[in-house]
Every structure is written in C-alpha cells, then in structure tokens.
C-alpha cells in the first residue's frame, strides 16, 4: 500500500487552493477510501499551524487543523532518532532541516512517497520517492 508523506508545502497548497491542490484532494480521497495512507511529520504539522496562524490568526489555525484532523492523517512524532537522521540528511543533501524530516519520513519504506512543493528536497531524489507539485504560476 502506498503511503503518502505530505509535507507542509503540500498541505498549504491544499488549504490555499494553489497549484497541486487537486492532487492533494485525490490523495485525501484515496486515504479516506482506504486505498492508501497519509502520514505527516509532527514538524510539518507544526509548520502548517504556525503559517496558518500568522496568516489567519488563532481561530483560523484552529479551524484549519480541525478540518485536517478530520481526515485522520497519522501525525508521526519526532523522536531522537528521527531528529538525528534528519540532521544527517540536512548535512549530506544540503537541504533545510525541516524539509529533511519529510525526506526521513519518506525513507521509512519503499511504499512511502514524499509529496511536496518544495524543490529544495530535489537533492534527495535519489534516496527516496518524491512527487513534486507543480510550481505556482508567476504573476
């Protein structure tokens, strides 16, 4: 069974209705139908919370997290081992630390696929399966 690891950029694209939101909707529908699973690193969950709170205030954040929680995504805790693995990924692949948690999560099995709009993780493409969302249109 495919396990989609959504990072903060993928979730924000969904919430904002931006490029790639339709793909995320399809992934969520498949998850709800039991066709595949969706996991999110606690780091990315917190990143979504912070960005939504900054944009829309505490009430907006609470509403968005409630909406997302209803989907039943598995929020994967940050353990000491994951923190160290992510640090190694950051150093070896020269990607931002928070993004490294998505790469680490996608490395849990061959069934995992990282879904992201963040092209900083391209350096890890040879290590894990990554599905990149389309770039935002330039205005």
Predicted regions and their residues:
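Acidic, PIN/NYN-like endoribonuclease modules and their adjacent C-terminal/linker elements
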Residues: 1-3, 103-139
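Short, well-structured N-terminal submotif of metal-dependent ribonuclease cores
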Residues: 1-40, 53-66, 136-139
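Alpha-helix capping/helix-boundary segments
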Residues: 10-11, 44, 82, 102, ...
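Phosphate- and divalent-cation-binding pockets in alpha/beta enzyme and binding domains
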Residues: 23, 47-48, 85, 123-124
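Short acidic, glycine/proline-enriched helix-loop-strand junctions
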Residues: 64-79, 83-84, 92, 122-139
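Active-site neighborhoods of divalent-metal-dependent phosphate/nucleic-acid chemistry enzymes
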Residues: 74-113, 117
